[in-house]
Amino acid sequence: MYHIDVFRIPCHSPGDTSGLEDLIETGRVAPADIVAVMGKTEGNGCVNDYTREYATAMLAACLGRHLQLPPHEVEKRVAFVMSGGTEGVLSPHHTVFARRPAIDAHRPAGKRLTLGIAFTRDFLPEEIGRHAQITETAGAVKRAMRDAGIASIDDLHFVQVKCPLLTPAKIASARSRGCAPVTTDTYESMGYSRGASALGIALATEEVPSSMLVDESVLNDWSLSSSLASASAGIELEHNVVIAIGMSEQATSELVIAHGVMSDAIDAASVRRTIESLGIRSDDEMDRIVNVFAKAEASPDGVVRGMRHTMLSDSDINSTRHARAVTGAAIASVVGHGMVYVSGGAEHQGPAGGGPFAVIARA
């Protein structure tokens, strides 16, 4: 079993690896122990956001120097999930997850944090947003749970996926082979990819039966969702990266995790209740929180708590950017700062207009 350490480090630019270098050089983490890095980069979070790819490349190169591996080999052993968009008060940062063998001499009472990773195969352009992506993701989630030593779905608290999107070149490739992509709108393809990935998580966690999952389910049947899913689409990969985070009696981490679901983009009360479930009940105790991870979206019916919003009809700013700013501010108002992980686009991730979240804290 494992001992998990988690570090949140600020970023001064998308290519900034100084925080990671400092963790390694001061001996706080061994480079070989790093299994995942989740980051918020200061791009637009849309199709042409290359800050995600740049950040991943720089982090992989940094770790590669310490591991004496080429960057592409680092990306095969470390799950990199870069989420673009730090609108509003959101602050660019990385969350580094390190995993080493459990420390039997210091085994705490109760369940503690554990984490596992897995990767799907590369997807053909015509598979993105469809049943193939759903089933492949479900299989990867189960492998990540086994990798983490999470024995029961009840002990699973958050599943993070990084998934691909469609580009004009990918669309042309599909058509050249006589295949039709799920959409020809590259921005819309992000939603399809996130949605299919989320439904794959729902299949793995038994929140949705396989009989209800067909191509047409994605972005159509909003009754289908996962309360544990967080999916982020990007231009920098062709497969899905999966991180499963939960708890285990055998884990020896000093950390714990709890999760909840925001009913809408401003549901700070749910975040507060989940934090309190970890025994954090005052502002003085907020420093126990390592990070909060959340999904956010503009309510697709155009209404928040009975009042009309204009996030979906703004021709200048994509709705995912609005949603990140709103939910980022709501969570920041609870924890007291904006260095939290909020990802836009919550298709099939929690209720329409809301989204799942998780809190990692020191026990």
Swiss-Prot record:
The active site is at K162, S232. Residues 112-249 are annotated as: RU B. Keywords: Hydrolase, Magnesium, Metal-binding, Plasmid. Belongs to the cyclic amide hydrolase (CyAH) family. Residues 1-104 are annotated as: RU A. Inhibited by barbituric acid. One of its GO terms (molecular function) is metal ion binding. Pathway: Xenobiotic degradation; atrazine degradation; biuret from cyanurate: step 1/1. Optimum pH is 8.2. The gene is atzD. This is Cyanuric acid amidohydrolase. InterPro entries: AtzD/Barbiturase, AtzD/Barbiturase_RUA, AtzD/Barbiturase_RUB, AtzD/Barbiturase_RUC. The monomer structure is formed from three repeating units (RUs) that share the same structure as one another. The monomer, the active site and substrate all possess threefold rotational symmetry, to the extent that the active site possesses three potential Ser-Lys catalytic dyads. It is possible that any or all of the three active-site serines may act as nucleophile (albeit only one can do so per catalytic cycle). It catalyses: cyanurate + H2O = 1-carboxybiuret + H(+). It comes from Pseudomonas sp. (strain ADP). Mg(2+) binds at E297, A346, Q349, G350, P351, G354. Homotetramer. One of its GO terms (biological process) is atrazine catabolic process. Responsible for the hydrolysis of cyanuric acid, an intermediate formed during catabolism of s-triazine based compounds in herbicides such as atrazine and polymers such as melamine. Catalyzes the hydrolytic opening of the s-triazine ring of cyanuric acid (2,4,6-trihydroxy-s-triazine) to yield carbon dioxide and carboxybiuret, which spontaneously decarboxylates to biuret. Its EC number is 3.5.2.15.
